[in-house]
């Protein structure tokens, strides 16, 4: 995420509208924060009530991975600030379709006595991924579009890889629930 967000996004803005780079990056960050926050809450709630043979979380993680690929490719093609904002916010929604269910999965599948350890492992992996993503992103500063495409495909791989490693059990036998505002 930070490979695109912290490195390639500002470089892309520089290509489109260099005279207003700081303002546009701030606009993108602000809009993305709102989209990500709302998406995390809503998608987390919907993943709680999802019933499928692949489990509650896995379908959202896979859909988020595919959506992240598509929205990053859309962002890469953006030629205006408006298109960048819409594509970037769409990416945040898709990215949170990976993050929210993944975090909920940890709560679902890990025994309470092991949650501290698993949370530490998750945090360690998160930090490595964030800084590693910036290192990878920086390799593409002279070819920003290529870098965004590479990062989009890396994000696409993340969901199926997580699903293969985790193997969430079916949720078809769980009692059905309906989405309510209380879930938010």
Predicted ranges, named:
Residues 169-184:
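Juxtamembrane intracellular "pre-TM" segments in multi-pass secondary transporters
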Residues 49-65:
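Cytoplasmic membrane-interface "Motif A"-like loop-to-helix N-cap segments
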Residues 90-124:
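Cytoplasmic helix-loop-helix junction between adjacent transmembrane helices
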Residues 62-79:
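C-terminal ends and interior cores of transmembrane alpha-helices
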Residues 25-47:
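Central cavity-lining transmembrane alpha-helices of secondary-active solute carriers
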Residues 1-33:
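Helix-loop boundary and gating motifs at the non-cytosolic
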Residues 63, 145-164:
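Symmetry-related core transmembrane helices of the 12-TM Major Facilitator Superfamily/SLC fold
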Residues 32-37, 116-141:
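Glycine-rich segments within core transmembrane alpha-helices of 12-TM secondary carriers
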């Amino acid at each position: 995420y930070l490979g695109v967000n912290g490195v390639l996004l500002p470089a892309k803005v520089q290509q489109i509208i260099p005279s207003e780079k700081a303002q546009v990056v701030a606009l993108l960050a602000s809009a993305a924060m709102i989209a990500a926050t709302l998406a995390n809450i809503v998608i987390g709630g919907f993943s709680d009530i999802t019933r499928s043979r692949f489990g509650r979380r896995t379908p959202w993680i896979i859909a988020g991975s595919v959506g992240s690929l598509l929205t990053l490719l859309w962002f890469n093609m953006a030629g205006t600030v408006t298109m960048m904002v819409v594509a970037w916010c769409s990416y945040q929604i898709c990215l949170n379709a990976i993050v929210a269910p993944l975090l909920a999965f940890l709560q679902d599948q890990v025994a309470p006595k092991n949650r501290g350890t698993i949370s530490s492992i998750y945090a360690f992996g998160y930090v490595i991924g964030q800084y590693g993503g910036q290192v990878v992103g920086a390799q593409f500063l002279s070819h920003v579009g290529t870098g965004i495409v590479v990062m989009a495909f890396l994000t696409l791989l993340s969901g199926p890889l997580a699903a293969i490693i985790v193997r969430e059990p079916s949720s078809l036998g769980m009692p059905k629930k309906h989405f309510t505002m209380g879930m938010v």
